[in-house]
A protein has these predicted regions:
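Acidic, PIN/NYN-like endoribonuclease modules and their adjacent C-terminal/linker elements
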Residues: 1, 120-151
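Alpha-helix capping/helix-boundary segments
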Residues: 8-9, 38, 118-119, 137-138
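Active-site-proximal, substrate-binding regions of enzyme catalytic domains
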Residues: 19, 39, 43-101
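Structured helix-beta-strand junction loops
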Residues: 28-29, 89, 141
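Histidine- and aromatic-rich ligand-binding microenvironments
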Residues: 3-5, 11, 95-96, 112-114, ...
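Short, well-structured N-terminal submotif of metal-dependent ribonuclease cores
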Residues: 1-38, 44-61
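Active-site neighborhoods of divalent-metal-dependent phosphate/nucleic-acid chemistry enzymes
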Residues: 80-129
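Alpha-helix N-cap and coil->helix boundary residues
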Residues: 17, 21, 34-37, 95-98, ...
Length: 151
């Protein structure tokens, strides 16, 4: 089982310098998993970018205002693509690790941002030792190995 991080899914949906590697990861024959933390990040980052492109929002407050006024209906097709990617590839949705000690320890021990610590602790809870990511911060986590994205 390989845990898939936000930046891999994002790079499948949006052209980035990692898109070819991300496609290779998604097409691997391995079982893939992710979590609500990753999907929340993916939806947020994707909609924030789309809102800027479509409505000229330049900051978080403007983004929130646009969503409050327009709702999610202007993004229905985009959201269908995001959620469809997970469903179509049969990426397993894992429950997050709600053990606060695990989360706090991952933050403190590896100097991870809160969401990255949540992802690492979720991998720990589910005994997942491989992560597909373009985030070098996960290289510091001793129970995770970052898979070689060039394969």
């Amino acid at each position: 089982m390989i845990f898939v991080d936000t930046n891999v899914l994002y790079s499948v949906l949006v052209k980035t310098k990692f898109s070819k590697s991300a496609q290779n990861i998604i097409l691997m024959s391995s079982d893939l998993a992710t979590s609500a933390t990753v999907l929340s990040e993916l939806v947020f980052v994707s909609l924030r970018k789309l809102c800027k492109e479509r409505y000229g929002t330049n900051n978080y407050s403007e983004f929130r205002r646009a969503i409050a006024l327009k709702g999610y209906s202007p993004f229905k097709e985009d959201l269908d693509l995001i959620f469809g990617l997970v469903g179509d590839r049969d990426i397993l949705m894992l429950p997050i690790n709600d053990n606060l000690d695990d989360w706090n320890n991952a933050m403190a021990r590896y100097n991870l941002m809160p969401n990255d610590a949540m992802i690492a602790s979720t991998c720990l809870k589910h005994e997942i030792s491989k992560i597909a990511t373009f985030d070098s911060d996960f290289l510091r986590v001793d129970w995770l190995s970052v898979i070689d994205q060039s394969k």
